[in-house]
Amino acid sequence: MTILAIDIGGTKLAAALIGADGQIRDRRELPTPASQTPEALRDALSALVSPLQAHAQRVAIASTGIIRDGSLLALNPHNLGGLLHFPLVKTLEQLTNLPTIAINDAQAAAWAEYQALEGDITDMVFITVSTGVGGGVVSGGKLLTGPGGLAGHIGHTLADPHGPVCGCGRTGCVEAIASGRGIAAAAQGELAGADARTIFTRAGQGDEQAQQLIHRSARTLARLIADIKATTDCQCVVVGGSVGLAEGYLALVEMYLAQEPAAFHVDLLAAHYRHDAGLLGAALLAQGEKL
């Protein structure tokens, strides 16, 4: 069965055909509409999928935000603008006349990463550290999404009750500290206004403040991983995202995790897939997993 897989992100929309062999073909990409209106998103999705839909039997969507009853929600509604409650599944079914599923992009990526693992692994957690912090949980060989689509949103667990306010409305979330946005927001002095990429570059050049910001992020993530081990007893944690895969970052996380009691240690792995994990995971789910 060939799946028309779609990835909806904050800056880009991607689509591709993915067969039973897992090969990605005819990949297309468009910018996410800046206007954040339902009409603009529908038009962009139509342009994206129209050349591909005749070659597919199902549609699978991996999207930023929370997917509940086929519609788009978010922990921080302001991130979606006019797209809050956008009917993703219904829209794609109308555009393509194909059966459609939708899932959070980090949950989809977690499923792709799980399928790439070697050995007898039944329980794993995927964490993406990028602009935000997201994740997905596989338990007993099954992806956990939850009845409301919230499962795996581990970036919104508490890291510091006296920390910065997160976009979700809580104070001191992991995302508000460890993410690329969190790293940049904490920069002061000559680093004020710099993005995470610049801060990583400066850290590599020996800038003390930049190094401290990255260590703060890695330490926060290590504590989250210890909490995850305590709550899931997972066999491994896979780390991805632009921050998670930045040079030297995972080694720092491993160093701080080693400082936790041994019961909370767990194998850390770098993500196998990068940009297209959401596309592939959604397609794999559409080919055999009931959501």
Curated annotation (Swiss-Prot):
Species: Shigella flexneri
Functional pathway: Amino-sugar metabolism; N-acetylneuraminate degradation; D-fructose 6-phosphate from N-acetylneuraminate: step 2/5
Subunit structure, interactors included: Homodimer.
Record PROSITE patterns: ROK
Coiled coil: none
GO biological process entries: N-acetylneuraminate catabolic process
Protein name: N-acetylmannosamine kinase
Reaction catalysed by this enzyme: an N-acyl-D-mannosamine + ATP = an N-acyl-D-mannosamine 6-phosphate + ADP + H(+)
MF-aspect GO terms: ATP binding; N-acylmannosamine kinase activity; zinc ion binding
Top enzyme category: transferase
Gene: nanK
Chain positions recorded as Zn(2+) binding sites: H156, C166, C168, C173
Lineage, uppermost ranks: Bacteria, Pseudomonadati, Pseudomonadota, Gammaproteobacteria, Enterobacterales
Residues given in the record as ATP binding sites: 5-12, 132-139
Chain's role: Catalyzes the phosphorylation of N-acetylmannosamine (ManNAc) to ManNAc-6-P.
EC number(s) reported in the record: 2.7.1.60
Recorded superkingdom: Bacteria
Entry's family note: Belongs to the ROK (NagC/XylR) family. NanK subfamily.
Keywords on record: ATP-binding, Carbohydrate metabolism, Kinase, Metal-binding, Nucleotide-binding, Transferase, Zinc
